[in-house]
Design a protein with these regions (language model features):
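N-terminal secretory signal peptides that target proteins for export/translocation
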Residues: 1-2
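A composition-driven surface/loop motif
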Residues: 5-11, 24-173
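C-terminal segment of classical bacterial N-terminal signal peptides
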Residues: 16-24
Length: 173
């Protein structure tokens, strides 16, 4: 009897271990602010790495969420002028569920590059998926930005836009 019971418990444990589980995004209580960062930094669990010398934010398996009531009238990610966001892989997401919380804010020129996909979701009519103070916002390679905003997809305060590559794709949902 005890052997049957033990076999049943072990079988149940093995089956439960084989079940798919949900992976939850890291909640942002404070913004990722790279504007005055002079040292390299990374959070592999959240899926980002900052190269200070080239002002490049690399995202690979990025999974960040700003919960409701946090970072209101701010942004999830702040970048300095002449920054680059290098997108790797197709499993990158940035969600802002807070009032007027932009996804990515840049002080000036912002470049997206890489062969990956980044999904940015904002949950406020007064928020932008991408907000550039000076612009331009440039897309290289075959980077794909899938934006699902309640507000703006891209907002450039002092627009000087250019699109030098025909290999970009902006998908609106």
């Amino acid at each position: 009897m005890t052997k049957k019971y033990l076999c049943g418990v072990v079988s149940a444990a093995v089956l439960m271990g084989a079940c798919p589980t949900a992976v939850f995004a890291a909640d942002l209580e404070n913004p990722l602010d790279f504007r005055s960062m002079t040292e390299d930094a990374a959070d592999t669990d959240a899926g980002w790495a900052w190269d200070a010398s080239s002002q490049t934010l690399t995202v690979e398996n990025l999974s960040l969420t700003v919960p409701q009531g946090k970072l209101e009238e701010r942004a999830a990610i702040y970048l300095p002028d002449e920054s680059t966001v290098r997108v790797k892989g197709s499993n990158n997401s940035l969600n802002t569920l807070s009032y007027h919380c932009n996804g990515i804010y840049c002080e000036g020129e912002l470049t997206f590059e890489g062969k990956g996909k980044l999904k940015i979701v904002t949950d406020s009519y007064s928020a932008s998926a991408i907000y550039a103070k000076q612009g331009p916002v440039t897309f290289y390679d075959s980077v794909e930005i899938a934006a699902d905003p309640d507000g703006h997809v891209i907002y450039i305060e002092k627009a000087k836009g250019k699109t030098p590559s025909s290999a970009y794709r902006m998908m609106l949902k």
